[in-house]
Amino acid sequence: MQTIAEILSKELNETLPHVQNVIELLDGGNTVPFIARYRKEMHGSMDDQQIRKLADRLTYLRNLDARRSEIKQSIASQEKLTGELSAKLDGAATLAELEDLYRPYKPKRTTRASIAKEKGLMPLAAKLLLQEPAADPVKLAEKYVNPGKGVNTPDEALSGARDIIAERLSDSADIRRYIKELAHRSGAITASRAADAPEDNGVYDMYFDFSEGLSTIPGYRVLAINRGEKEGFLKVSVNIPEEGAERIVALSVVRGSCPCSKQVEAAAKDAWSRLIYPSVTRELRSMLTDEACEQAIATFAVNLKPLLMQPPVKGMVTMGLDPGYRTGCKVAVVDETGKVLDTAVIYPAPPHNKIAEAERIVTGLIKKHNVKVISIGNGTAGRETEKFAADTVKGTDVKYVIVSEAGASVYSASKLGAEEFPDYDVSLRSAVSIARRLQDPLAELVKIDPKSIGVGQYQHDMPQKRLDETLEGVVEDCVNSVGVDLNTASVSLLSHVSGINSTVAKNIVAYREAEGAFRSRKELLKVPKLGAKAYEQCAGFLRVPESAEMLDNTAVHPESYRAAKSLLLLCGSDISKLPDELKRIGMDKAAEECGIGVPTLKDIIRELQKPGRDPRDELPKPLLRSDVMEMSDLVPGMELTGTVRNIVDFGAFVDIGVHQDGLVHISRICDKFIRHPSEVLKPGDIVTVWVLEVDQKKKRISLTMKKER
């Protein structure tokens, strides 16, 4: 039997020592960002996503082993654990396979078969299974008639014996495996309109007469069908070829055509229709749902990461507009660091239409604070607010950007929002958040539950614990990839740093408020509850620009300061000479002299050449706009530049500046075949698109990224 490390090595195509090292590091309480960044020599430079995948599979395989042990103990206690069965259990690669093998030995609630066994009909079932040509089933059954046990006639005895045979067939791991293989090859999931379905608004139209193969149906359709069934619109079933399934069951047990064989054949048909079909279809649907959820969670993660990693718009005084109709549009002006300078409420949209007054207020704030860019939320009244802003800044150098306001209202009404802005109305907090989202998306978005950011499909239908764990991993990876300024970071941002929990994050901020700015990374050890292990995990991801130690403002870990200083000595503290010096002595020799591995050496060189490097600066900046377009302005063939807002399994939604995102179907993203849009696109990408079709009535815009030739 393979060890877990050997299984993972084969699955992930990583060397066994590297896998063993990662397992040891994880078991030692090291975080994924720390392992990925500062232990590269131990795992061959696996990235954070690869390590998380390994950690996920490690948990699954350990749970599998634990369940295997439980099952073996249970069967052994029944004195039924044979060498052959033990080997089969050892060979089971999934929990489903394990449970199928355990079915015959699993304690059951009362069933028709268990009642028949209590009536003493097991020997009759065994005799029927012998299928002796000369045997008469009725005469065999007469011996088991016992009114005292509730067996009044030979027919009742035969019925009970068939129930025992049917359950035995239903519990066969081999039969269940063959049926599932048949279902995967030839089965389909079907949906139709439920008899008592409520009035439909068109959402489930395509599923009222629907059938698709189990092996080909995409995950998003599985989740849509599940939701339609849950809401009472759809009746859903799994179709498995009945003739083929019955043949599989019968061939496993029926021999010949004697009278006893007819009884066994009847039991086989009953096993299929009454026991195997309902059970297997439940399993198949559960499996489809699990796979669909994993795919949807992965898509959510793919969308979330680039949203968090959007390049900040630095060094600009920013105005945030939170649009609204009746309650007005909330305005907040923040300086280059995100500090609130001014707030106001304007009413440019219906029913008030106080456009002139709103223009006067906004123009005054722009001049007073030298506002350079306006950040506009894309929610209710966003269209009218965008037009108002475009008209107001026309002829000036002020630009505007539409930002997603998803989650802003959640933050503004949260305990965190109240603590940060106790004197501001909830709606004004939203305007501040919208302004800050443009200045530093990561620092602002970490204050919000990732599920509220609005980039997932069917997120409420997914296992919430699994979704939370995955999204938290994405947030953690992003925060640690960028690094955090120890003297300006909020509790929310600090709590996502490797090795720091919310309690320690609060203690860091409390220490900062009491003692003033941190003057070095080493000072972190004075923070209550931040011990040596936490310091090891977090220090490299925290920056202290004010420190006398230059390396404290880089991603170089304190454990590598001596190596970094040895490197500086090599080039006489002139970083520009370092490449020539390294070429002269060689990377391997330099690493050896510094007492580190080559991967760590390369990371240190990168940091010394660009101290304070922000990986977000290398990504495309948000599109700044100065005018507005209407949907009616669009015509087929028109070329536009847009921003990818969201990735879904069937395509990508692109903001082209008309307040209604257009859809680029997966087939129109590129010329080569792709399985998923995320292979070539991510949220935040700036793309060139062409208009294919505009449906004003349904508010739908179809786009293509493939220029028509």
What are these regions (language model features)?
Residues 181-188, 321-325, 379-384, 403-410, ...:
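A glycine-rich phosphate-binding loop feature that marks nucleotide/adenosyl-phosphate handling sites
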Residues 47-53, 60, 64-320, 324-424, ...:
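Duplex nucleic acid-engaging cores and interfaces of nucleic-acid transaction enzymes
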Residues 74, 99-102, 228-241, 251-276, ...:
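Structured, non-catalytic alpha/beta "coupling" segments that mediate domain-domain communication
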Residues 38-40, 129, 241, 323, ...:
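Short, ordered loop/turn segments at secondary-structure junctions
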Residues 1-20, 27:
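Generic start-of-chain signal for non-secretory N-termini
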Residues 544-709:
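Single-stranded RNA-binding regions, centering on S1/OB-family and related RNA-binding modules
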Residues 4, 56, 62-80, 90, ...:
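Long, highly charged, low-complexity intrinsically disordered interaction regions
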